[in-house]
Amino acid sequence: MKLLKSTASLGGEILEMDLSQKLSQEQINFLNQCWNDRLVLVFKKQNLDDNKLINFSKNFGELDPPGPNPYGVKFLPEFPEINVISNVKNKEGTPIGNLGDGEAVWHADMTYQETPPKAGILYALEVPENQGNTHFANMTLAYDELPNKLKQKIDGKTLIHDSAHNSACLLYTSPSPRDSGKSR
């Protein structure tokens, strides 16, 4: 197992690791160390079914269910931990997943929760030939690079928002976390 570091401020590719197999504690420790150092890890050419994806994910802690979606549909009811993200529609024109074309604009996952998940795992079944258009930002570095005057102005402040709308401003059909006292 190896880490190939990106030249960017975050990111790295994990080499020589088969995620479909049960990981040893040494491998889990290695991945945690790499993740803490690089913030985003890429594992190419993996072959995981839904169970194996969940088993791999559980190596890093308890899994959070996905947030609400605008369709009010559980796309994989047998795997409630998995959020299907797709721009594909079935024959009837119904989306087969969340975040279709136009919705997945710049965002941070599930930050409306009191304690947002510490990580997300994105497993791509199909990747465009141009490698898609997904980007990640090092928000710790962004904060560190702010002018001291701005840091003083915002330190101690809290932002409150909810999940009533998605990133494309579509109203979700699921209840807002505010209704259950879960908002941030």
Regions from the language model: what does each represent?
Residues 1-134:
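Non-heme Fe(II)-dependent double-stranded beta-helix
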Residues 23, 48, 146-149, 175:
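Short coil/turn linker and secondary-structure boundary residues
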Residues 133-171:
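Hydrophobic, aromatic-enriched interface-forming segments
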Residues 172-179:
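Conserved small/polar residues in nucleotide/adenosyl-binding loops
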